[in-house]
Amino acid sequence: MALELTKVNKDDLELIMTWRMKPEVTRYMYTDPALTMETQLKWFYSTQDNDSVKYWIIKFDGVKIGLINICDIDYKNKRCSWAYYIGDTSFRGRGIATLLECNIYDYVFDDLNLNKLCCEVFTSNEKVISIHEKFGSVIEGTLKQHIYKNGDFFDIVTMGITRDKWKNIKKDYKYDKICIE
């Protein structure tokens, strides 16, 4: 299994747009956008000169299967947030989350030299919460009725892991290093 992260380029925008509008992908996202190529291009260009975000396409054996990002990169306070989705749902359940989780932790703490990695997850997305907890992230709080979507309010948990914690536990996990462009 060869997994790699390649920088998003303009040729990826139509595929990202397709993934981003799938109900099974947006179910646990804050928005359900009706995207166009015009809005995709605008988003893409907004990321190009923005040092506080990084976006990659997730490739599995050369096939583009999803998107991963680091955002809110704060070098002063040494923290950032992250998120990802597997847009091609036929690739879910293959251990990809393990590789992404461990390698992003290494990238954030070793390459970017940050101290904390955060994320926000719908409380109903128990599978993802469990994955984050498995690799050392802890729930730091709950944002009550934080997202209004499809006529309902949803609670969100905030999660985080620090550099020290990851350094202390990473030896317990066996994972291959992946190429991050």
Which functions belong to the PLM regions below?
Residues A2-L15, D61-E181:
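Acyl-donor (CoA/ACP) binding surface of acyl/acetyltransferases
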Residues I16-M17, V25, Q40, W82:
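Hydrophobic pocket/interface hotspot
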Residues R20:
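Residues forming the ATP-binding cleft of Hanks-type serine/threonine protein kinase domains
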Residues P23-E24, D51, L112, G136:
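Structural motif
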Residues E24-K42:
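Conserved GNAT-fold acetyl-CoA-binding loop/helix
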Residues R27-M29, W56, I169:
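Short, hydrophobic secondary-structure boundary micro-motifs
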Residues L35-E38, T47-D49, I86-G87, Y175-D176:
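Juxtamembrane/interface motifs at transmembrane-helix termini
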Residues Y45-I57, G66:
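A short helix-loop-beta-strand connector motif used in the catalytic cores of GNAT acetyltransferases and
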